């Protein structure tokens, strides 16, 4: 009995000494009792399964004793190739128990992430497309190679997308809803706008790329970090099973307080071959203080205005990789037609679209894409901001007279019905959320969301000529974004709430394995050398 007591006391002392850090987020808006748990890099699948089984038992025991939290339990499970973790609603005692597991790297409070854009007036001139294919501002045409991103898939990790919008021509599908609100549509308009800039026929850069909508933010433009990490994980797995991560681009026009969990998830996506374009933020401050913009491996994008100055709202600093048009950008809106929005949210999809364009044209992927964008860009930005290491504005190569433009497909010549610059589309009947397109039986619907491994809809798009008539002035009621005002949103029908389902549990920890890890000399070396890796 004495020996057992000694062992128990020793284990408790070692566990307390080596407990994972429970991070503090004093300046962030946190989700009550919601946490993200990240495991150490060397955690095996068996270790992770044992931890989940133990967690189920421990959590059930704690809740049975106290029963102070509603809807508690695991929400999301993350399983990248080199990063495992989960999120959920837990009481304080359960979180302390979780932190004692030597396989846990850190525990982070779940915080609120928001879009980086705002709705402004309609019918301003469209200039972003022309700017990225010409050496000087003020050009009137967008010149591009006819490959136009064909064979590349773009993941819109955002508020959802109106996949039925005419500008997507059947190349957009609904992928996943990590908000779990039962509302498979874009009730904000933000995700549809950013997607139009990336792949739209009229407004887009990569006009032949495919698009997958991954909803991680609600109709108010905000959502928890845990759901965004889940959206990244889903996108990586879907890309792996549908053409490969090296033919995939992810756009994240969102951000919030610095989050180790979100940065690690973004880094994992890049490590597995995806290109990530991330908005720098709209606070006119150092982007290093926000996530995922502060993650070094992503391509962090600041916003430029029509005169090549840094947009007054754009964040700056060492995290910035590139600038792209972000002020007064016209793109698609849910239900048909278009609207104008400003923000680094509008700049990031210019980079994502151009990345897809270059990946198709030059066969590059991953980190090489951001480097190539820097090579092709022009040193045009004035007042890039304190500590910003670059003043490069993106360009598709037309500004330097070489690649990528071996077989240009110029915008049509001006005529009374076919203007040379991209114009707003003629109004049409609003698409119904989730309604399948003709000839595309594989497209998921709200009641049948796409799953990783599901094939894309048919390759060719209809190719019908798009009317060149300018869209008459129409004011679109937009969403209100943090720190900014906008007209009241259009009324939306209520949607039911669907709570997350906890993952089931199983066996307890292996005591012999724990003993070896606690008292084996190799444990100490590994713990201190890998804690922050």
From Swiss-Prot:
GO molecular-function annotation terms? Answer: serine-type endopeptidase activity
Family annotation (InterPro entries): PCSK9_ProteinaseK-like (IPR034193), Peptidase_S8/S53_dom (IPR000209), Peptidase_S8/S53_dom_sf (IPR036852), Peptidase_S8_Ser-AS (IPR023828), Peptidase_S8_subtilisin-like (IPR050131), Peptidase_S8_subtilisin-rel (IPR015500), S8pro/Inhibitor_I9 (IPR010259), S8pro/Inhibitor_I9_sf (IPR037045)
Q: Which UniProt keywords apply?
A: Glycoprotein, Hydrolase, Protease, Secreted, Serine protease, Signal, Virulence, Zymogen
Gene coding for it? SUB1
The recorded induction information for this protein reads: Expression is up-regulated during infection.
- Compositionally biased tracts (Pro residues): 405-470, 488-502
What the entry lists under PROSITE patterns is as follows:
SUBTILASE, SUBTILASE_SER
Localization in the cell: Secreted
Q: Which residues are glycosylated?
A: 233, 251
Q: Which residues form the Peptidase S8 domain?
A: 126-400
What range does the record give for the signal peptide?
1-19
Q: Would you tell me the protein name for this molecule?
A: Subtilisin-like protease 1
Please give the residue ranges the record annotates as the region Disordered: 175-198, 282-312, 378-512
Q: Which GO terms describe its biological process?
A: proteolysis
Cellular component, GO, one term: extracellular region
- Stretches with biased composition (Low complexity): 471-487
Active site location: 158 (charge relay system), 190 (charge relay system), 345 (charge relay system)
The propeptide segment or segments lie at 20-116
Annotated Inhibitor I9 domain residues = 34-115
Bias (Polar residues) occurs at: 282-294, 378-394
Q: Which family does it belong to?
A: Belongs to the peptidase S8 family.
Enzyme Commission numbers on file = 3.4.21.-
């Amino acid at each position: 009995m004495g020996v057992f007591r000694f062992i128990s006391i020793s284990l408790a002392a070692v566990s307390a000494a080596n407990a994972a850090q429970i991070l503090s987020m004093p300046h962030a808006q946190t989700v009550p009792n919601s946490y993200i748990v990240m495991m150490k890099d060397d955690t095996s699948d068996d270790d992770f399964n044992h931890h989940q089984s133990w967690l189920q038992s421990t959590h059930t025991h704690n809740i049975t004793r106290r029963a102070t939290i509603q809807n508690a339990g695991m929400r999301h499970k993350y399983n990248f190739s080199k990063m495992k973790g989960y999120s959920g609603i837990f009481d304080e005692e359960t979180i302390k128990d979780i932190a004692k597991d030597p396989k846990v790297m850190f525990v982070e409070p779940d915080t609120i992430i928001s879009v980086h854009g705002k709705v402004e007036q309609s019918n301003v001139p469209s200039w972003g497309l022309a700017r990225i294919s010409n050496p000087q501002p003020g050009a009137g045409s967008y010149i591009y190679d006819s490959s136009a991103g064909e064979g590349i898939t773009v993941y819109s990790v955002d508020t959802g997308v109106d996949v039925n919008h005419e500008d997507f021509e059947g190349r957009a599908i609904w992928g996943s809803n990590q908000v779990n609100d039962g509302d498979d549509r874009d009730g904000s308009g933000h995700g549809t706008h950013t997607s139009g800039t990336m792949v739209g026929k009229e407004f887009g850069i990569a006009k032949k790329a495919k698009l997958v909508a991954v909803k991680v933010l609600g109709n108010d433009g905000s959502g928890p970090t845990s759901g965004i990490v889940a959206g990244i994980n889903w996108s990586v797995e879907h890309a792996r099973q549908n053409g490969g991560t090296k033919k995939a681009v992810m756009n994240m026009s969102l951000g919030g307080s610095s989050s180790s969990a979100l940065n690690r998830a973004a880094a994992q996506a890049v490590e597995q071959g995806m290109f990530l374009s991330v908005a720098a933020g709209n606070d006119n401050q150092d982007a290093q203080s926000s996530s995922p913009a502060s993650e070094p491996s992503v391509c962090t994008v600041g916003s430029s205005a029509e005169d090549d100055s840094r947009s007054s709202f754009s964040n700056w600093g060492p995290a910035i990789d590139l600038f792209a048009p972000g002020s007064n950008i016209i793109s698609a809106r849910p239900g048909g037609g278009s609207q104008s929005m400003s923000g680094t949210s509008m700049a990031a999809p210019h980079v994502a679209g151009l990345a897809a364009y270059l990946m198709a044209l030059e066969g590059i992927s991953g980190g090489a894409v951001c480097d190539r964008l820097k090579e092709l860009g022009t040193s045009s930005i004035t007042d890039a901001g304190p500590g910003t290491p670059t003043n490069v504005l993106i360009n598709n190569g037309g500004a330097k007279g070489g690649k990528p433009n071996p077989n240009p497909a110029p915008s049509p010549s001006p005529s009374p019905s076919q203007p040379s610059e991209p114009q707003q589309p003629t109004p049409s009947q609003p698409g119904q959320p989730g309604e399948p397109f003709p000839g595309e039986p594989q497209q998921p619907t709200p009641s049948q969301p796409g799953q990783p491994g599901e094939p894309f809809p048919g390759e060719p798009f209809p190719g019908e000529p798009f009317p060149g008539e300018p869209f008459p002035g129409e004011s679109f009621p937009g969403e209100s974004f943090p720190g900014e005002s906008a007209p009241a949103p259009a009324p939306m029908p209520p949607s039911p709430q669907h709570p997350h389902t906890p993952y089931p549990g199983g066996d307890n920890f292996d005591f012999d394995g724990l003993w070896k890890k606690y008292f084996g000399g190799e444990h100490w070396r590994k713990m201190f050398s890998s804690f922050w890796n």
